[in-house]
A protein has these predicted regions:
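Short Gly/Thr/Asp-enriched flexible loops that form oxyanion-binding sites at enzyme active sites
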Residues: 92-105
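Poly-acidic low-complexity segments
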Residues: 79, 99, 118-121
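Conserved "HGTGT" condensation-loop signature of ketosynthase/thiolase-family condensing enzymes
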Residues: 1-84, 105-110
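N-terminal start-of-chain detector that recognizes signal peptides
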Residues: 58-59, 90-92
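Active-site nucleophile and cofactor-binding loops and adjacent substrate-binding regions
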Residues: 57-59, 115-121
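Compact, aliphatic and Gly/Pro-tolerant "microcore" segments centered on a short helix or tight beta-hairpin
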Residues: 104, 112-117
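Short glycine-rich or small-residue beta-strand-to-loop segments that form or flank ligand, phosphate
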Residues: 85-91, 118
């Protein structure tokens, strides 16, 4: 089967406001670093991670996904009724069943004719 008129028209993301840097973590671990004679900067050097971002406790992944989907839909300029599929990819879920993609589909206001696929680990 060949598909026609399929494309990624818009891309959106939502970043959490809370930022915790590797330096912040090392500051909390300073007594341990001093006791073990570890140089500052080791965490970023070993992980390659400069900063981490966190949503507030209790934030549901599907809520962030729905917010982001709405942004992407708006940026695309495509009418909601023209969407044929929603593919939701995430490591985290709101609950075991139904799939988080179902809630995102509903919250984004996509039509019932729009197929839903939830890709998770």
């Amino acid at each position: 089967m060949r598909y026609q008129n399929v494309r990624l028209e818009a891309f959106a993301y939502t970043l959490p406001d809370e930022i915790v840097t590797s330096d912040d973590i090392e500051e909390r671990l300073r007594p341990v670093y001093e006791r073990l004679h570890l140089p500052v900067g080791r965490l970023e050097l070993m992980t390659g991670i400069r900063e981490r971002r966190f949503f507030p406790v209790g934030t549901r992944p599907g809520d962030i996904s729905a917010q982001t989907a709405k942004k992407a839909i708006e940026q695309s300029g495509i009418p909601l009724e023209s969407f044929g599929a929603l593919i939701h990819g995430s490591v985290c879920r709101d609950q075991l069943e139904p799939a988080t993609a179902c809630g995102v589909h509903s919250a984004a206001g996509l039509p019932r004719s729009c197929a839903v696929l939830d890709v998770s680990n």
